[in-house]
A protein has these predicted regions:
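Long, ordered, helix-rich scaffold segments
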Residues: 1-183
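Gly/Gly-Pro-rich "capping" loops immediately C-terminal to redox-active cysteine motifs
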Residues: 12, 196-198
Length: 198
């Protein structure tokens, strides 16, 4: 019933204003796919590689599963900039749907132009929003994460410093002004020593 309203909002939305985009997303809660499909049908943004940035931003915030195939196409399309492809991967990462998790696994496979970004999102979401989709097997099969292969190594604790020399000994030392000037030159890069430094 509200699809026509959202289409009009999408037409008028200044997508550079994150609050406007968020307002559409909040209003579309629990019906994101229906709203996205209506907006896509009416605005006709063209093939995924030709979407205007405004439509890509709306798609990012309408977290339904409907645009998954389009987002996957954008993520792997080398005619798009790296930032545009990464934004498509990020858009998939916010979709709470088992298909989104599977698409992300595909994007994290060998040869994918967004393998690194997809892998990072998988690791982030596998213990969070997507934990219920049991990604463990897919992560293990693709060599991304296998908890059984993790080796825990002890971090060596450094030896404690020896005792400091007595103050009397330090006071007996003769200073070397040229060496002191050199040492202070390193310090004044960040600190102020007398009239010099930052």
């Amino acid at each position: 019933k509200t699809a026509d309203i959202f289409v009009e909002l999408a037409r008028r939305c200044d997508t550079t204003d994150k609050n406007s985009v968020e307002a559409i997303g909040l209003g579309a809660a629990n019906q994101e796919s229906v709203i996205w499909t209506a907006i896509h049908k009416e605005l006709q943004p063209g093939p995924p590689s030709e979407w205007p940035e405004s439509f890509a931003r709306l798609t990012w915030r309408l977290w339904g599963a409907a645009p998954l195939d389009n987002l996957k196409a954008r993520a792997t399309d080398l005619s798009l900039s790296l930032d545009q492809r990464k934004f498509a991967v990020e858009s998939i990462a916010f979709i709470d749907d088992a298909r989104a998790a599977r698409v992300m696994l595909e994007l994290a496979s060998e040869g994918s132009p967004v393998k690194g970004e997809a892998t990072a999102w998988l690791l982030r979401n596998a213990a969070g929003e997507w934990a219920k989709y049991d990604l463990a097997k897919g992560l293990k099969n693709q060599g991304i994460y296998d908890p059984e292969s993790i080796v825990i190594s002890a971090a060596p604790v450094p030896e404690p410093p020896g005792p400091a020399p007595a103050v009397e000994k330090i006071l007996k030392l003769k200073g070397d002004p040229s060496r002191g000037r050199t040492a202070a030159a390193r310090c004044i890069l960040c600190h102020q020593v007398g009239e010099q430094g930052n």
